[in-house]
Amino acid sequence: EEKTENGTLPIFGSFFSGRGEKLITLFYCVTFFPVTLVYGVALINALSNLLVEHLHITAISRGPLSFIVVAALYVVLSKGRDRVVAIMSALALPFAASVLLIAVSLIPGWHLSNLTDTAAEMNATPLPVTLKNIWLTLPLITFSFCCAPMVSPLSSYYRERKAEGEKKALFVIRIAYLAIFASILFFVLSCVLGIPHDNFVRAKAENLNVLSVMKGNGDFSLIYHIAPLIAIIGMTKSFLGVGLSVAQTFGQLAASVSGKKASASKRLASLALFLMTFGIVYANPDVLSLIEMFCGPLIAVILFLIPAYLIYTRPSLAELRGVTVFLVVLGGLATLSALLWTML
């Protein structure tokens, strides 16, 4: 990989130049800006739920709350990558430990019937219908396991600051994906087995995450009080992780297109992102619809299709060619086709 000045896109910046680099940078922003909206909406909803249901504070309406929170997030982003990475690093381990603790605390309340009942329903459902339902969840799955915007700044940071930075960056990426994959699977399994179905229905209806509607049982009633706080920390960390790469990339794109000073262009870009984020977060669109219609399919292009294209068009990546690449392409096309089906 060639070294580039574009630290926000260390991979794409190596294989595109000129107009191609501007287009891929724009597509990156278009892809991951909706992800920040998902986390922004989820954060405001979780915070509002905490204030109303747990602290019984109803004086703050959604408008002022959204403005204050979104403004605070963009102030943090304006401090630069090093500061955001430091904040993310400080939050990462406590947040991960808290999520795993909640997942473990749910184990005494596991009910295998939650799985067996679902399995029985699947057996009673025709196989084509079951496969179709799984297929239509691909955008959600793609979104859930994507951590590219958060891993990219971290790996770029190590690449630039450490000796043998390339090896350190690859190590960070591998460990991050392994940890995220394992923790997501365990947490989801524990929630499915330990949380009543009605809670999931309520979360979907109220546009909340599952931690905000979690209720403790017996010795674990403390979960009712700490789970919403953990959800807020998680949404904040995720917003900063994704928003960092989007803000920096959009700022650099604005500077290159406008021809103005980089500092002025970045301030204008940040202001535009802030206003759009505030407006959409205040509107409170359905989070799952955002993921299914925008985030999942666009992320599939970034994660599956563009890398496959580069592997077969760039000689430096020839060693990566093989059957695996075709499987990656199939995964991307399947995710995109799920979007097209829902639009019909």
Describe each model-derived feature in a short phrase.
Residues E1-H56, P228-L253:
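Hydrophobic transmembrane alpha-helices that form the core helical bundles
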Residues G13, V41-R62, S156-A163, F171-A179, ...:
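Helix-loop-helix connectors at the membrane interface of multi-pass transporters/channels
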Residues Y28-F32, S105-W110, A119-C191, A227-V242, ...:
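Hydrophobic, membrane-embedded alpha-helices of multi-pass small-molecule transporters
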Residues G40, Y74-L77, L93-T125, I141-F145, ...:
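Hydrophobic alpha-helical segments and their helix-loop junctions in multi-pass secondary transporters
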Residues L43, L47, G63-G109, E292-I306, ...:
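Membrane-interface loop-to-helix entry segments
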